[in-house]
Regions:
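N-acyltransferase acceptor-side catalytic subdomain
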Residues: 1-195
Length: 195
């Protein structure tokens, strides 16, 4: 079995980490270095942990933290990020989360995995984390059934949503079906919104 390496970073830009996030299904912009840079301008600090195998990132997370009165709060939004081809990594990441919380003297830590993070939630509970219904900084994930014709899709939306779509089209917004080749552009757009 190959040895894993843990790398700690605090820099506000990390193109290697951002590239890793682009390559995995659950990579989210809230974990990208651009998001950390935007939050650092608002007084947050960042600690990024990357787990490497053969000099290649296979998982990690980014903790943002700051002082709030007498305590230090931290959060991991839409993380940890894990390469699906790396089973067993979750246990290592949770240990690193606890270590980083202690190292950075974080009193209260919110870990908010991705929507597909059911195994992460279970592993966190097994390791002493308590469930809480706190919301992340951005709660804007939407799942939309796009099966059927465009008319079918629109008919499943509320009247007000359909009205806003028509207004947007009148203002020049173009709607088209995306392709796999558009994903990198979409991810870049999400990163640019963090700047």
């Amino acid at each position: 079995m190959e040895k894993l390496t843990v790398r700690t970073g605090t820099q506000d830009t990390d193109s290697e980490w951002d590239h890793f996030l682009e390559q995995i299904p659950d990579g989210r912009f809230e974990q990208c270095s651009g998001w950390a840079a935007a939050k650092m301008e608002q007084g947050w600090r960042c600690s990024r942990i990357e787990i490497l195998r053969s000099s290649r990132i296979i998982g990690g997370f980014q903790i943002l933290f700051r002082n709030k009165g007498p305590i230090r709060i931290g959060y991991i939004s839409k993380g940890p990020a894990i390469d699906a081809k790396s089973p067993g990594l979750l246990r290592i990441l949770i240990k690193q989360i606890k270590d980083q919380a202690a190292t950075n003297r974080i009193t209260a830590l919110l870990v908010h995995p991705t929507e597909n993070g059911h195994s992460v939630y279970a592993a966190l509970r097994e390791n002493g984390f308590l469930p809480n219904k706190l919301y992340s900084v951005i709660e804007a994930t939407l799942f939309l059934d796009t099966s059927g014709s465009q008319t079918d899709v629109l008919n499943r939306m509320s009247r007000k949503t359909r009205q806003k779509i028509r207004q947007s089209i009148k203002r020049g917004v173009k709607i088209r079906e995306g392709r796999d080749s558009d994903l990198s552009t979409f991810f870049q757009l999400m990163q640019d919104t963090c700047k």
